[in-house]
C-alpha cells in the first residue's frame, strides 16, 4: 500500500512539473507598427481637414506609448496634449473615450476615472483592433466637439481596415 501511495505521489509531482513546464511564460502579442501608426495619424488629420477642422492626431501602441503624431496647420497647441491623452485613455481602457465620458456622466462612481493620471474623458479616442485584440489607439483633438474628433478617428480606421485583419 505504501508503494502505491509513493508511486501515486511521484506520478502526481511529475504531472505537475510537466504542466508547469508547458505554461506560457513568454507572450506573443500583436502590436502597432510605425507605418500603420503614421497612416492612421495622417488619415485622421486629413478626415478632419476635409470638414474644415484643424486637429492633432496621436497614435499609441497597445501599451499607450506614442508611435506617431501629426498636427495640422493652425491646430491649437492644446490639441497635442488632448490627442495624446485621448489615445492613451482609449488604449488603456480598450474603449472609446466618448463611451467612457458618457458612462461617467451616468455613473457617479465612474466619474473618478478622471483622477487616473493621463486619462482624458472627452470624445476622440478610439481603440485600434485586430479582431478582438486592441493593438493601440488613436486620439484626435481640435474639432469643435469630441464627437467630431471621434468621427475623424473612425474615418481613419475605416481607411486602414484591410490592414487590421
Region locations from a protein language model:
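Flexible, solvent-exposed loop/hinge segments and secondary-structure transition points
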Residues: 22-165
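Generic short amphipathic/hydrophobic targeting helices enriched at N-termini
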Residues: 3, 21-22
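Bacterial N-terminal signal peptides
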Residues: 8-18
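Bacterial N-terminal signal peptides that target proteins for export
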Residues: 1-9
Amino acid at each position: 500500500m505504501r508503494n502505491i501511495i509513493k508511486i501515486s505521489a511521484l506520478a502526481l509531482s511529475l504531472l505537475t512539473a510537466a504542466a508547469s513546464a508547458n505554461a506560457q511564460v513568454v507572450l506573443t502579442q500583436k502590436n502597432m507598427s510605425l507605418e500603420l501608426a503614421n497612416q492612421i495619424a495622417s488619415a485622421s488629420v486629413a478626415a478632419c481637414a476635409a470638414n474644415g477642422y484643424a486637429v492633432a492626431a496621436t497614435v499609441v501602441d497597445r501599451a499607450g506609448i506614442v508611435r506617431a503624431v501629426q498636427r495640422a496647420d493652425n491646430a491649437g497647441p492644446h490639441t497635442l496634449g488632448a490627442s495624446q491623452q485621448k489615445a492613451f485613455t482609449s488604449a488603456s481602457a480598450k474603449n472609446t473615450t466618448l463611451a467612457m465620458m458618457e458612462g461617467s456622466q451616468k455613473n457617479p462612481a465612474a466619474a473618478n476615472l478622471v483622477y487616473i493620471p493621463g486619462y482624458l474623458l472627452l470624445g476622440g479616442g478610439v481603440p485600434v483592433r485586430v479582431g478582438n485584440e486592441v493593438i493601440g489607439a488613436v486620439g484626435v483633438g481640435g474639432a469643435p466637439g469630441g464627437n467630431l474628433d471621434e468621427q475623424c478617428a473612425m474615418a481613419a480606421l475605416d481607411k486602414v481596415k484591410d490592414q487590421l485583419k
